[in-house]
Amino acid sequence: MRGSCVAWTCALLGATFLSTPCLAQALTSSMLTPSIGGFAPAQDSPLRPVNAIDPATGVPAIYGNPPASGAADTGYDSLNRKRKTKPYPGTPKPKFVGPGNPSNPPLQAPRVVPPVSPSFAGIAEGAPPRRKLKVDGDPFGQVGNYVGGFLVKEAVEVSGGYDTNPGRFAQPQGSAFYRIAPELQATSDWTRHALNLDLRGSFTGYGTTFPADAGNSSVPVNIDRPDVDGKLTGRIDVTRDTRIISALRLRVGTDNPTTPNPQVGLSKYPVYANFGGTLGVEQDFNRLQLQVNGNVDRTVYQYSKLTDGTSASNDDRNFNQYGAQARLSYDLMPGLKPFVEVEADTRVHDLRMDRYGYERDSNGGYLKGGTSFEFSRLLTGEFAVGYGLREYQDPRLKRLDGLLTSASLVWTATGLTTVRFAAASSIDETTLPGVSGSLSRDYSVQVDHAFRRWLIGTARFGYGTASYDTRQDKRYFAQADLIYKLTRTFAIKGSVRHDWLVSNDSGADSNQTIVMLGVRVQR
């Protein structure tokens, strides 16, 4: 019935006179995106031209041939505009790429790579899922070696440079120098308990000797200086809430040229050694934590070698220090832990009287309060403020007391910039006649910025004071470092530093500039 209707319709339209049968209209697959010839094939279209014979040439007319070679989409335009080809009706218009936007890159053929075994690729049947490797935050950092249950890291820096005033003279006298600084760190990798070693040292040698007849200056002829700082800390986990804390420490060095302690006429600086230990217990009571420590330290000076070939004893500067320390802290909230700390100690010298007839034995201590914090790992550290005092047995020596501050803060400003702030205060011994001691305070700010992962720039600024009763010293310094990391093992380091000393004592002012370049080898 349906076919007869189609035939009747074609007859009415005169289709019976056509050489081809009448077909229904063919639609494209998508009405929204039509294409040429999508509705009906070109050869079956009723609107196609008939292949009639041209009466002029007698050759059948052929349609659909491409235009001649000289034809183009462009023609004459008085404004010299290019004629654009109009898109087929209904086709989507191409997206316009504006200025400054990257064009779509051309499609590239996939690379031909060698085949990888399923076990190596982690796609073998029955294989456990492979863990994704962590991104290395410091690709040029020190790796270290495992020795048993310890991770050991060692390094050495060899550098040289020029110091415009190594002796801290009022009238600068410069000298070239070299420095060798080894380091050794060992950290235990145990499930329980801990043992850590941190040992650093340096030796600075100068190629210049200074005259022995430098007036009343305390600068020796040879100013070569060693420096060693080491600490061994341990922890024994008795229970989940009880721990035994222990530590051994060592400090080797010489008197600072900026202090008035060195005597006149030295051939070289006498070396001192400060060593001691700590033993204590740490107990947790829920959020409350109590730590009690006992400390024993000893300070020893070697004999001073004078320019006339004789030696002078420094036994009056040797002393033992015994003390006890207690710290109470409370975990107020995650990342905030306030604390209170108290310490008491006594110092007993080897000789009752020093070289000027003063009794230097004393009792002292401090009380301070502060907090340790960690805010989303962007700001971490500890800050405390307190009060310290020291009473001397000799009534001629005044009590030494004052405000004490201590801080160690790290602020990660960005992923490339880190800011550090440090503060320290101490009550130190002195050899000046009639002076009880010195109260020292030091503050420093350090900014580290990674221009690249292998190029690190550092800027440091510092300020410090030292009070010797009537004498007041102020110290300033500014330093800039640049580290170029070649590999994880080798790095090149350059440094420029300038120091100022301003004192109310006549002739004690000084300034110096240090330029240094060296190589660091680490593993």
What is each stretch, according to the model?
Residues 184-188, 232, 236, 279-283, ...:
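Residue-level signature of outer-membrane beta-barrel architecture
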Residues 154-156, 197-199, 246-248, 292-294, ...:
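Membrane-embedded beta-strand positions of outer-membrane beta-barrel proteins
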Residues 158-166, 192, 201-207, 250-254, ...:
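Transmembrane beta-strands of outer-membrane beta-barrel pores
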Residues 482-485, 489-491, 495, 511-523:
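Outer-membrane beta-barrel "beta-signal"
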Residues 2-12, 19-155:
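N-terminal periplasmic/intermembrane-space "pro-region" immediately following the signal or transit peptide
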Residues 192-196, 240-244, 285-292, 335-338, ...:
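Repeated loop/turn-to-beta-strand initiation elements of outer-membrane beta-barrel proteins
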Residues 178-184, 226-232, 273-279, 320-326, ...:
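Hydrophobic, lipid-facing positions within transmembrane beta-strands of outer-membrane proteins
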